[in-house]
C-alpha cells in the first residue's frame, strides 16, 4: 500500500489538475480539498485509486463521487462561513467534511443506509472532523429539526424536486440536486427559493446513484 506521503502527493496533483481545468475556482474549495483528501474516506483497498478523477466504490453498493463532481457542486453552492447546510446522502462522509471545512460550523448530513452511517462516522472521526452530524433517515424528506437551510446539497438522483427540501430552504437559499432518470442520467439543477417561488438553473448532465425515499425513487 502507498504511504501517506505518496497518497498526499498524488492528491495534490489531482487538486492542481482540477484548478488548471477551472473546476476548482475558489480558495475555499481548494483549501477544503487539501485538508480532507478523498483517500481518508475510502476503504484501504481503494486508497491508491483515490486521486483518480472517477467515482469509487464504498460499502453497501454505493459510490463516492469523482473529485471533479464534488468540486463542481461545492462551487455552485458558494458556501460561506456560518451557513446552515444540509447534505442528503452522506455516503463516505467526504463531502460533509469538505462542507464543514468551508462553513466552519455544524453540518447536518442524512443517510438511509445504516452501514454507511457507521462508515461515514468512522471516517469523519479518523479525519478529525468534529462538526458533522450524521443522521440515519430518509433524506428525501429533509431534516426539519435544523431547518431552514441556506443550502441543501443532494448527492443522489431524484425523479423530481422533493417538495420538503424546498420547504426547508430559507428565502434566497438554494438546493443543488441531480434530477432525471433512475440510473445514470440526470441533470444537475440549482434551485433557488425566492419569495415568489423557485428559479431553476440547469448545470448539465450528471450520473448519480438514485435517491431512494418517500420523495425520491421507491426501492
Swiss-Prot record:
It comes from the Archaea. It holds the Pfam family PCMT. The active site is at residue 65. Coiled coil: none annotated. InterPro entries: PCMT, SAM-dependent_MTases_sf. GO terms for cellular component: cytoplasm. PROSITE patterns: PCMT (PS01279). SUPFAM superfamilies: S-adenosyl-L-methionine-dependent methyltransferases. One of its GO terms (molecular function) is protein-L-isoaspartate (D-aspartate) O-methyltransferase activity. GO terms for biological process: methylation; protein modification process; protein repair. Its EC number is 2.1.1.77. Monomer. Catalyzes the methyl esterification of L-isoaspartyl residues in peptides and proteins that result from spontaneous decomposition of normal L-aspartyl and L-asparaginyl residues. It plays a role in the repair and/or degradation of damaged proteins. Belongs to the methyltransferase superfamily. L-isoaspartyl/D-aspartyl protein methyltransferase family. This is Protein-L-isoaspartate O-methyltransferase. The lineage of its organism: Archaea, Methanobacteriati, Methanobacteriota, Thermococci, Thermococcales. The gene is pcm.
Amino acid at each position: 500500500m502507498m504511504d501517506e506521503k505518496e497518497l498526499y502527493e498524488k492528491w495534490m496533483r489531482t487538486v492542481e489538475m482540477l484548478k488548471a481545468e477551472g473546476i476548482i475556482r475558489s480558495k475555499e474549495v481548494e483549501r477544503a480539498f487539501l485538508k480532507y483528501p478523498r483517500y481518508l474516506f475510502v476503504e484501504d483497498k481503494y486508497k491508491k485509486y483515490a486521486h483518480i478523477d472517477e467515482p469509487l466504490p464504498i460499502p453497501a453498493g454505493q459510490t463516492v463521487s469523482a473529485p471533479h463532481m464534488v468540486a463542481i457542486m461545492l462551487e455552485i453552492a458558494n458556501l460561506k462561513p456560518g451557513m446552515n447546510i444540509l447534505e442528503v446522502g452522506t455516503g463516505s462522509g467526504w463531502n460533509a467534511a469538505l462542507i464543514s471545512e468551508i462553513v466552519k460550523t455544524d453540518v447536518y448530513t442524512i443517510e438511509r443506509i445504516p452501514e454507511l452511517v457507521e462508515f461515514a462516522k468512522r471516517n469523519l472521526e479518523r479525519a478529525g472532523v468534529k462538526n458533522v452530524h450524521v443522521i440515519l433517515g430518509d433524506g428525501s424528506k429533509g431534516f426539519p429539526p435544523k431547518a431552514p437551510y441556506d443550502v441543501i446539497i443532494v448527492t443522489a438522483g431524484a425523479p423530481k424536486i422533493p417538495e420538503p427540501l424546498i420547504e426547508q430552504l430559507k428565502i434566497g437559499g438554494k438546493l443543488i440536486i441531480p434530477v432525471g432518470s433512475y440510473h445514470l442520467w440526470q441533470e444537475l439543477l440549482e434551485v433557488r427559493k425566492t419569495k415568489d417561488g423557485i428559479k431553476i438553473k440547469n448545470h448539465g448532465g450528471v450520473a448519480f446513484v438514485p435517491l431512494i425515499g418517500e420523495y425520491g425513487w421507491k426501492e
